[in-house]
Regions:
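Hydrophobic alpha-helical membrane segments
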Residues: 1-233
Length: 233
């Protein structure tokens, strides 16, 4: 399918049910708004007329690695953000396949934190992070390419966990399958991501409020991309 068709599928899914989609994405949306506001605060604080004390405090909070465990905090926030997003993607995948399904925003959005998914999803995150970092040591471009190659591993795991015993699912196999599935499609997904850039900028300019609608739209479109991949393989 074309980018326009994938985006249409996402919007069609939400027709009459935008409230469900927004509530499902509430936690990562709030995080995005907070980050946007913090960035805005930093920009303001660095202006010539900003208060020096505020500027120094924001510099320490946002950029300092000393004493506060900022590096560890960044890793932790990255893991949490991924877990929330994956749980939402799992729900969208079920929703695409059963458009009339009832959405429980809290239960569905946090499903990755259950025994069925948590450890395997976390392991996929750790492995893909390690692999991407190692490739990035060569040059940044190989790291970006590999991140796209690994991008479908979570949804592949979701499908496999529904068909066979959890104990038999290998996180590494899901990553390998993602690489195979993405052969010839990495650039396509990159362009799909790029097509949202204008909306991302508008969302930031609205101090993050636009993410309330944009986050569900982007997440659902990426799930539609995965569904299209497996339909054609």
């Amino acid at each position: 399918k074309t980018r326009a068709e994938l985006k249409y599928d996402a919007k069609a899914l939400f027709k009459g049910r935008w409230k469900d989609a927004i509530l499902l994405n509430l936690i990562p949306t709030i995080l995005s708004i907070v980050v946007t506001l913090l960035i805005a605060a930093v920009v303001i604080s660095l202006s010539d007329n900003a208060d020096t004390t505020l500027r120094n405090w924001l510099d320490n909070v946002m950029f300092s690695d000393e004493g506060t465990g900022n590096g560890t905090s960044n890793v932790g926030s990255g893991i949490l953000s991924t877990l929330f997003t994956v749980g939402i993607s799992f729900t969208f995948l079920d929703w695409f396949r059963n458009p009339k399904m009832e959405i429980n925003p809290l239960k569905n959005g946090l499903q990755v934190f259950t025994k069925k998914y948590f450890l395997r999803v976390l392991l996929i995150y750790i492995l893909t992070s390690i692999f991407t970092t190692l490739w990035s040591l060569l040059l940044i471009i190989p790291g970006i390419i590999k991140s796209y190659a690994y991008s479908q591993a979570y949804l592949i795991y979701k499908d496999q966990s529904s068909s066979i015993s959890n104990e038999n699912i290998s996180s590494l196999d899901c990553i390998t399958e993602s690489k195979n599935l993405m052969k010839g499609h990495k650039w396509r997904l990159f362009i799909l991501d790029l097509s949202f850039l204008g909306w991302d900028i508008l969302a930031v300019l609205s101090l993050g409020i636009g993410f309330i609608w944009l986050m569900p739209y982007k997440n659902a479109t990426k799930v539609a991309f995965y569904q299209d991949l497996i339909n054609n393989n």
